[in-house]
Amino acid sequence: MKVLVIGGGGREHAICVTLAKSPKVDKIWCAPGNGGIAQVAECVDIKATDIDGVVAFAKGNKPDLVMVAPDDPLALGMVDALEAAGIRAFGPRKNAAVIEGSKSFAKDLMHKYGIPTAGYAVFEDSVSAIAYIKEQGAPIVVKADGLALGKGVTVAMTEEDAIAAVKDAIDGGAFGGAGARVVIEEYLTGPEVSVLAFVDGKHLKTMPSAQDHKRAYDHDEGPNTGGMGAFSPSRFYTEDIAAQCMETIFKPTVAAMAAEGRPFKGVLYFGLMLTPKGPKVIEYNARFGDPETQAVLSRLDSDLYDIFNAVIDEKLEEIDIKWKDDAACCVVMASGGYPKAYEKGKVITGLDDVTDSFVFHAGTSLKDGQIVTSGGRVLGVTATAPTLDEAIQKAYADVHKIHFDKAHFRTDIGIKKG
């Protein structure tokens, strides 16, 4: 079988590597791919958001399945366009991907269906938003409504920081159209947990829990990023909490989307906060998280191609998905300066010296036979082991073997206590 994967980051590398393990899959294309993905798939020079280009390629090359991984093409309706052309596609349609594409839609959905989340208000003008901030006080959370590469959230510890975030988003255009509307939320406390689930429109099967590290620097300091590392499972996500989330959050969300005429098919990511008052939803993503996917898929013990087909055919209930007991840790190596300005084209050395981890490539490309940096998040060094502590040690031992100019990584992935 032939599969086309859309995207070019560490998440897509993990998806391609996992699909390549399937005895049913004998050909993988990835558009646009990257320097690491090129080792397991044929990279195609088509942008992930080029719907017409992807559809034309699929019509010409006839993949048995197209897997749309990133948020932007999902929000633009790539799955709808592929299905309209008679091509099997994995991922939510445009009207379901809105659960990530608009935070105000997601908040209103949760409010309507009684799904636990933080209190909130939505604003399109800064004057009203600032008045609300002054009324509520700090700490408070300001979120751009639309897609902002994971960087549209400000956890403001002072009113001044919150007001600055509102002005940047609405008046300053910091996130373009994505920030023209903002959601202002109550500040929640507790451990954060990511739970991804396969969803076929009616049923869902959750993956093992994970925990992301969004801040750029150690001790959760610095600006938000797309994610500096992840580990699985979460230390805090017990069987009791999992059962509670299934009844109060996971099933109600899938049912709510179906009731709204927006059945969700694909991977639904639940960003949760385990508060003193119980689990609450911080955010939804309409796709595999990055870098959680690198950690979680390293633990998969079933055929990913079969799972994708079960989702598309709405037969998720008929398959059994197995996971390894091992823990996993993914440490992201980023370009110096990320998530702000950074340089590209730095030669990466030491990849052949890695012994105990798998290195997922994110912002890399091939240049004159060498792997060079081409993005903010460059590599995801991922190790599995019987215990989380062992996985962390293995991952960091290999991180220290890899070098590129101004490389930056957090030293506390997996050590986080809350």
Question: Which residue ranges define each predicted feature?
Answer:
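Active-site nucleotide/adenylate-binding loops and adjacent lid/helix of ATP-dependent enzymes
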Residues: 4-5, 100-181, 211, 235, ...
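Peripheral (often C-terminal) accessory segments that flank ATP-dependent C-N-forming ligase machineries
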Residues: 310-418
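Solvent-exposed alpha-helices and their adjacent loops that cap or buttress functional pockets
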Residues: 20-21, 36-38, 60, 90, ...
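Active-site "cap" helix and flanking loop/linker of ATP-utilizing ligase/carboxylase catalytic domains
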Residues: 246-268, 285-354
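ATP-binding N-terminal substructure of ATP-dependent carboxylate-amine bond-forming enzymes
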Residues: 1-94
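Short, charged, surface-exposed secondary-structure boundary motifs
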Residues: 38-41, 55, 98-104, 217-218
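Internal nucleotide-binding/catalytic subdomain
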Residues: 156-293
